[in-house]
Curated annotation (Swiss-Prot):
PROSITE patterns recorded: CYCLOTIDE, CYCLOTIDE_BRACELET
Name this protein carries in UniProt: Cyclotide phyb-A
Family, as annotated: Belongs to the cyclotide family. Bracelet subfamily.
Record bears the keyword Disulfide bond: yes
Taxonomic placement: Eukaryota, Viridiplantae, Streptophyta, Embryophyta, Tracheophyta
Tissue: Expressed in midvein, lamina and periphery of leaves (at protein level).
Its job: Probably participates in a plant defense mechanism.
GO annotation (BP), single: defense response
Pfam families from the UniProt entry: Cyclotide
Keyword vocabulary terms for this entry: Disulfide bond, Knottin, Plant defense
Post-translational modification comment from the UniProt entry: This is a cyclic peptide.
UniProt free text on domains: The presence of a 'disulfide through disulfide knot' structurally defines this protein as a knottin.
UniProt xrefs under SUPFAM superfamilies: Cyclotides
Cross-link Cyclopeptide (Gly-Asn) mapped to chain: 44-73
Length: 79
């Protein structure tokens, strides 16, 4: 029974720590950062494939290869 009680106490402690951290996190002011330009800067819509060894399979829907990545309808990034 000692093992069960210590396991239960450890579980309660973990739940308490998580609750306190989540409560503190919701009260903290978090800056909203727009990361869309960091991951896809002015490149239009990514077609979801690379064209390192073979050309874009999605060329039928208007994708083209630039810098080893397929893009569609956007400003193609500089190399």
């Amino acid at each position: 029974m000692v093992g069960v009680n210590s396991l239960r106490s450890a579980l309660y402690l973990i739940v308490l720590i998580l609750f306190v951290q989540l409560t503190y996190f919701s009260d903290a002011r978090v800056m909203d950062v727009d990361l869309s330009r960091a991951f896809l800067p002015l490149t239009g819509i990514g077609c979801g494939e690379s064209c390192v060894w073979i050309p874009c399979v999605s060329a039928a829907i208007g994708c083209s290869c630039s810098n080893k990545i397929c893009y569609r309808n956007g400003i193609i990034p500089k190399k």
